[in-house]
């Protein structure tokens, strides 16, 4: 790798289109977390939970918002003031200092097995031991990592990044700039069986497609099944974390986020800009409205028709869930109070010796 470049804060401000507060000639040669940064590093502050690090950080400069810069101006630090998310500006800064890591296998590796009917566009990188099946189509500038498999009649758009050991089975249609992390499987048969007269479970053929829109990202070891007859669709801009299960004929709307270990059962429709928290389970054949947020470990058993934050199992509006959790937390105290009340009632209903007649 080449030596890291050095920029002054003035140069960084021009490149990032931000404002400098402090010494514009401060040299910066790297990026680092705010808690670990040294004088040659630039760091960022986005979440105010970490503002305690700002006072003692050794960073040569910190990227933050205008309101944060005003709040912490008394610290006399070097600030780069951004009008967008500090984290997003910091990401642009990373790209100035850190070179992309490549495998060192440019072009099409000789160990790759490519069917004669497959169509490979220009500037495609195909790493060792990749298999590309008949009538597959790989778009220009796409990168396919070692050991990956592209199934028959599948289409990958331009500028896709397929990491090693990915399986894209037959009948997967992928848009442009899609990223798939290692171990993911797209296009598996759905979990569909029919039980015969002898009680044996017979698998059903799944003939649908998996359709993935532009700018979708799919995490490691995530699985997306194709439908029996209809398609499983992931619309543009959606980001899916690791170890997520998307069942047959699910549709996920644009720009949604699905966090690790969530599971969506068959034929469910997820709206746009939905956030599904980790380990959330969503039953099949329901729909989720746009702009719904499900906190971690939510259990969704019926359709959600209104935007908002939901939690619990079964899912309910978060404020209701929060109140229910508070009541459950107070159950031991409630039980103790109830026991005392029951004892008082028993004492009141039991006559004293003075009240019992001495003669009958």
Swiss-Prot record:
**Any idea what job this protein has?**
Catalyzes the N-acylation of UDP-3-O-acylglucosamine using 3-hydroxyacyl-ACP as the acyl donor. Is involved in the biosynthesis of lipid A, a phosphorylated glycolipid that anchors the lipopolysaccharide to the outer membrane of the cell.
Active-site positions on this chain:
248 (proton acceptor)
Q: Which reaction does it catalyse?
A: a UDP-3-O-[(3R)-3-hydroxyacyl]-alpha-D-glucosamine + a (3R)-hydroxyacyl-[ACP] = a UDP-2-N,3-O-bis[(3R)-3-hydroxyacyl]-alpha-D-glucosamine + holo-[ACP] + H(+)
Kindly give the HAMAP family that the UniProt entry links to this protein. Answer: LpxD
Record lineage: Bacteria, Pseudomonadati, Chlamydiota, Chlamydiia, Chlamydiales
Could you tell me the EC number(s) of this protein?
Answer: 2.3.1.191
Species per Swiss-Prot/TrEMBL record: Chlamydia pneumoniae
Question: Please, one GO biological process term?
Answer: lipid A biosynthetic process
Keywords noted in UniProt: Acyltransferase, Lipid A biosynthesis, Lipid biosynthesis, Lipid metabolism, Repeat, Transferase
GO CC terms: membrane
Quote one Gene Ontology molecular function term. Answer: N-acyltransferase activity
Please give the Gene3D superfamilies that the UniProt record associates with this protein: 1.20.5.170, Hexapeptide repeat proteins, MurE/MurF, N-terminal domain
Family membership, please give it: Belongs to the transferase hexapeptide repeat family. LpxD subfamily.
- Pathway listed: Bacterial outer membrane biogenesis; LPS lipid A biosynthesis
List the protein's name.
Answer: UDP-3-O-acylglucosamine N-acyltransferase
